[in-house]
Amino acid sequence: MDRTTFGRKTFNTQRNRLDRFVAPRDSFSETRRRRSWHAACDVQPINNDIWFGKNLKKKKYTKYLDKALDLESPDKSNSIKRMVQPWPCIPRKKTYLSSADSILDLPTYSYAIFPELLDWSNDNVLVAALGRNYHKWSWRSQSLISQGYAEYQIQCCKFDPRGELLLLGTYMKTVEIHNNVKSKKIDSNTCNCLEKDNRNCSITAVDWSPTGNSFATGCSWGAVTSFTRAAKLISWRHFVREAILLILIALSPNARYLAVTAVNTALVLLLTWPSLEMYSSIDSDWTIRTISWHPWRSALLGVGAVTDDLQARIALWDAPTCKVRDTSIGPKRYRLDAMLFSHRTGELVLSMWNSDRAILHPKACSQLVVMSDPDTMVDQWGEGRSGLDRVRTMVFSPDGTKLATATSDEDLIIWNFLPEDKKMKKTKCRFFSALPEYLDEAMQGYSLR
């Protein structure tokens, strides 16, 4: 069967029914389908999961009764600890992740070694890089609008903040800059690993500065480079003296710091931008999975990790003061895949999966979790036998109301993260003001009573 990038998909694709008296699964509502999978999940440890939908409703109702009856909550013992908000946030009052807006196809994405192959520009265009080609899909027209290609296989991609350029990190140490309108290469440069260390590398991570006047790259040999907007070299530093599979980099919102780490390592570096001088570092006994800057603070870095006993942890690192606060997230046996702060609400979005549940089902049964603090989950989706596979990367739409996730099952799912903005209504209507103005002119300012 021929598959096209950004082709329409459904969660429950199946062959046509031969028996016309048996209703297809798609005819049932999503809520009913999610309630019907109890047979394989009656195992006691899984049903006792505190993130299980039934237990979440009980917890929410308990809090409601405590507030209505003016009872003291058991959590009040830790009230002093929780008075300090770990990260700035305006949490939602309703849940919105119960439905997906669109489900599109990403052929061959499951074979990609590096996951950062998806981005969303400020002019509402999604890009997916697969192999040497990249494909652009317009949110407004809901269709594929253009395609482009790179000289080598693409490992990562990123739109500039202005939406004019597309940055591509590729194999053979090359970074390319493409014009977003024409989908053609206009500039390129290479990493200095070959000249300095006589090694060929791959560009595995890229990120733009907040102004779009410069960008950073990270390679598979642990080198970090800063470039101008025209791909001119600014600085180059080598921090890891061994081959690493995936390096992660992220520029702070105030454009002063560059966070650098490698997946499945324990060290996070903080460099000055754009000189790439060492500023600070943290070393722990965790396994680093992802990093993300909070968009509402000048330099508050979130570090997502997993401990040896499979406990997900989040460390919040305030770069100017070098203070680090870490806390556990959720129950044990949950592993962290991706993490992102919402620029609209400040909420923390996590993609996690339960290793125990993954043993029972062919899919890892990922959960998208939206948290306002380490102890409060305000929204979630993803329980069931046929649901969300592991999310490898995710990006927000420009207005922050949609969340696009790319899964190991080669699905691009666009979620309704928040309700769309209502159109501004005119507070003054010309139809009602025209008659009084005409009468005032006709009567030359006199008022007849």
Swiss-Prot record:
Keywords per UniProt: Cytoplasm, Repeat, WD repeat
Extent of the WD repeats: 108-148, 149-188, 198-237, 283-327, 345-382, 386-425
Record flagged with keyword Cytoplasm: yes
Subcellular location: Cytoplasm
GO biological process, one term: positive regulation of anaphase-promoting complex-dependent catabolic process
GO MF, one annotated term: anaphase-promoting complex binding
InterPro entries for the chain: Cdc20/Fizzy (IPR033010), WD40/YVTN_repeat-like_dom_sf (IPR015943), WD40_repeat_dom_sf (IPR036322), WD40_rpt (IPR001680)
Pfam families attached to this UniProt entry: WD40
Superkingdom field: Eukaryota
Record carries keyword Chaperone: no
Assigned GO CC terms: anaphase-promoting complex; cytoplasm
Motif D-box mapped to chain: 386-397
Family that this chain belongs to: Belongs to the WD repeat CORT family.
Function: Controls wing pigmentation patterning by regulating scale cell development, thereby playing a key role in mimicry and crypsis. Probably acts as an activator of the anaphase promoting complex/cyclosome (APC/C) that promotes the ubiquitin ligase activity and substrate specificity of the APC/C.
PANTHER family: CELL DIVISION CYCLE 20 CDC20 FIZZY -RELATED (PTHR19918), PROTEIN CORTEX (PTHR19918:SF52)
Protein name (record): Protein cortex
Organism: Heliconius erato (Crimson patched longwing butterfly)
Gene name as annotated: cort
